[in-house]
């Protein structure tokens, strides 16, 4: 899992 995607998901959550 890419940290970039995690950052995006974290922003949405």
Curated annotation (Swiss-Prot):
Main location: secreted
GO molecular function: toxin activity
Disulfide-bond pairs as recorded: none
GO term, biological process aspect, one: chemotaxis
Keywords, ordered alphabetically: Amidation, Chemotaxis, G-protein coupled receptor impairing toxin, Mast cell degranulation, Secreted, Toxin
One GO cellular component, as annotated: extracellular region
Tissue expression summary: Expressed by the venom gland.
Secreted keyword on record: yes
Leucine amide modification, residue list: 13
Location in or out of the cell: Secreted
Keyword Secreted: yes
Role noted for this protein: Mast cell degranulating peptide. Induces the chemotaxis of neutrophils. Its mast cell degranulation activity may be related to the activation of G-protein coupled receptors in mast cells as well as interaction with other proteins located in cell endosomal membranes in the mast cells.
Similarity-based family: Belongs to the MCD family. Crabrolin subfamily.
Name of protein: Vespid chemotactic peptide T
Organism this protein belongs to: Vespa tropica
């Amino acid at each position: 899992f890419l940290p970039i995607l995690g950052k995006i998901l974290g922003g949405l959550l």
